[in-house]
Amino acid sequence: MTQSHRKAIVTGATSGIGKEVAKLLAERGWLVGIAGRRVDRLEAMRQSHEGIVCCQQIDVTSPDAPSRLLTLIGQLGGMDLYFHSSGIGWQNNLLDVEKELKTVETNGLGFVRMVDAAFNWFAEKSSENKDSTASHPSYQIACITSIAGTKGLGAAPSYSSTKRFQSHYLECLTQQARMRHLNISITDIRPGFVKTDLIAGSNYPLQLDAKDVAKSIVRAVEKGKSVKVIDWRYALLVFLWSLIPRWVWTRMMIAK
């Protein structure tokens, strides 16, 4: 492990986009620490990928999640990028309240718990670096939100709403970092509908491959993009549906 290697922590790394991003970062020379709830999958990834050097079981809904993140950062020997991919959601046309609340707990409370822990760690390091002669590239936070946060989706109320919350929260943290003159950049990743467990069995259109999405994500992170919609078809779609008036949108059948 050398100082030339950049270090990334990936939460939600046991499946889907998070797993593919962790693998790709390792292939591109990053030293990667991974986190998630399923220890067996974490260990399997660590043993099969040279660049994935440590892992930690973290449930983002647990109050001890921030302390576990700090433990993982210590095991990795630092952190340059925090990548947040932990999230849940359901199609919920019958409005099962338990599903709605679980989604808020993970995508809302869990998201804030982890992103704030990473931001505060970076803020402390950024302040320390101001007092030294050594320069450091911008610390980075990158999070998977969704195009589902750009318009209300009646088939997935809590998921769509929490993704909207996440995007706004990241915008707030971006502004706060600049207000406090912190060396932190933030990337809001907004994929379209990706073929993962999250939308298994759904009829959402234009479903994307997780490996292809991961490649676009890593490029966006390494270029320091502030917002990245994946892919170009969804960027066009989001632009077009932003033009639809609310009274028209709420009468449309978006997915069932």
Which residues does each PLM region occupy?
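C-terminal helical subdomain
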Residues: 188, 200-238
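Active-site helix of classical SDR
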Residues: 115, 162
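Rossmann-fold cofactor-recognition segment
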Residues: 49-64
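Conserved NAD(P)H cofactor-binding loop of Rossmann-fold oxidoreductase domains
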Residues: 85-91
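Conserved glycine-rich cofactor-binding loop
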Residues: 14-15
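Short alpha-helical oligomerization interface
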Residues: 92-105
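Residue(s) in the substrate-gating loop at a strand-loop-helix junction
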Residues: 146
